[in-house]
Every structure is written in C-alpha cells, then in structure tokens.
C-alpha cells in the first residue's frame, strides 16, 4: 500500500489518486514525490549517502527545491538532531538512522507522510523517539498515514482502518475503539495494553471516565487512579 500511494508501485487494477494526481502516471512522479513522503521499515534501505548533508540534500536537488540549507535545518530541528554531532551515518544506531530518514522526508515538506512500519527494526528507545516525532508532527498539522501490524501503535492514530486481504473492512475513530474492542477480536488482533488495563480495572469495580480524553490522557488517568488505590 505504501509503495502504491507514493507511486513506487502500480496497483493491480484501477487507479490511485492523491489530490487528483494519478500515482501510476510516470510524468507526475516528481509532483507526487513533493506531495507524498514515505518512511520505510529499514532505514538502511533508504539512506544512500554516508554524510548527513549529502543525504538530506539529495532529494531536494532531485526535486529542484530551493532553500536547501534552511529546509535541512528545519527538518533536523523537528527530529531533534544536531548535525554537528553526527559523524558517518553507517556508524549510527538504526533508531538514529530512522530519524535521519524522517528528516529527509520532512525537508521536502510533503502534504502527506506515509510511515510503513517504521519501528519494526529499531529498539525500544528508538521506538519512543519515533513516536514522539509523530505526535509532534500531528500537533503541527501534518497528515500522516501510519501502517502497522502492531496494535499498540494504532493508539497513535485519530482514525483507524483495518485491512483484510487488501480491502478496508473496518473504520474506527480512536475514541470509539474503547467501546468496540470486539472488532479487534473479530480479526484476531491483539488488544492494546491500555484497553486491557481499563477492562481489568472495570472488573475490579474501578471505572475510569475516559470521555473527552486522548489515549495519552487515559494512560495518565490510569496511573493516577492506580497510585490513589495504592495509597488507600
């Protein structure tokens, strides 16, 4: 799906349009690359150069975008990387490399960013760094398509789509997911930990009001309630 949306592969049939751009049209490929950025699972398959300046400026030059230095500076700020502290890229951890690939996408400043299982290859510290970047991007108005098999990560989303055999079979708003856990069970998907904890607390007559709370807010509320229970 990620490769089709970004124009790297053609659909088996029909067509995919991104803001009226046909993703299969080779003549529109550069326009599509400016509009849709993509971050893959393995950053080592996405990084071409061993120098951070060369890596981040490569796509900008190919797409004939101006203000290269400013774009790179702003992109690195968003992923919290100081380029002066970065040596050769092949010496970085996978988590750091993934932050570099995200910066490369952000430098182009696309309308949409596709994250295709971006935390699969990285450790827990790297995962948390990527999650924070995504949350900040959402807060700053970026439109993100996040593809994952890890149901813990669906809590990052505002709207959740479940695909089965390449077809969209369910669409759920995140705030509705708490009351629609059976949908996940129907497709043999793991229940996110935060929802499992809420269900266990409810069985112990501890009911947490989750109305108007984000998932992060619910997590904080669970911690608060559990701390209060310990004190009592």
Where are the regions that the model predicts?
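Conserved ABC transporter NBD signature motif
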Residues: 14-24, 32
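ABC ATPase nucleotide-binding domains
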Residues: 183-232
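Conserved ABC ATPase signature
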Residues: 88-92, 96
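Conserved ABC ATPase "signature" region
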Residues: 66-84
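Catalytic Walker B motif of ABC-type/P-loop ATPase nucleotide-binding domains
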Residues: 113-117
């Amino acid at each position: 799906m990620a490769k089709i949306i970004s124009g790297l592969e053609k659909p088996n049939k029909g067509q995919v349009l991104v803001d009226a751009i046909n993703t299969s049209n080779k003549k529109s490929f550069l326009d599509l690359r400016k509009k849709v950025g993509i971050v893959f699972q393995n950053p080592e398959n996405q990084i071409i150069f061993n120098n951070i300046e060369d890596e981040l400026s490569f796509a900008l030059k190919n797409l004939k975008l101006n203000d290269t230095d400013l774009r790179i500076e702003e992109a690195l700020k968003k992923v919290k990387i100081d380029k002066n502290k970065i040596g050769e890229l092949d010496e970085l951890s996978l988590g750091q490399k993934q932050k570099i690939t995200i910066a490369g996408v952000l430098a182009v400043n696309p309308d949409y960013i596709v994250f295709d299982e971006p935390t699969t290859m990285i450790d827990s510290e790297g995962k948390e760094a990527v999650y924070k970047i995504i949350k900040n991007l959402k807060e700053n108005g970026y439109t993100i398509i996040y593809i994952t098999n890890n149901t813990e990560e669906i809590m990052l989303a505002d709207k959740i789509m479940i695909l089965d055999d390449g077809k969209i079979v369910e669409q759920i708003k995140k705030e509705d997911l708490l009351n629609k856990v059976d949908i996940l069970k129907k497709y043999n998907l793991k229940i996110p930990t935060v929802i499992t904890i809420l269900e266990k607390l409810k069985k112990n007559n501890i009911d947490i009001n989750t109305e108007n709370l984000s998932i992060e807010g619910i997590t904080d509320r669970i911690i608060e309630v559990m701390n209060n229970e310990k004190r009592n």
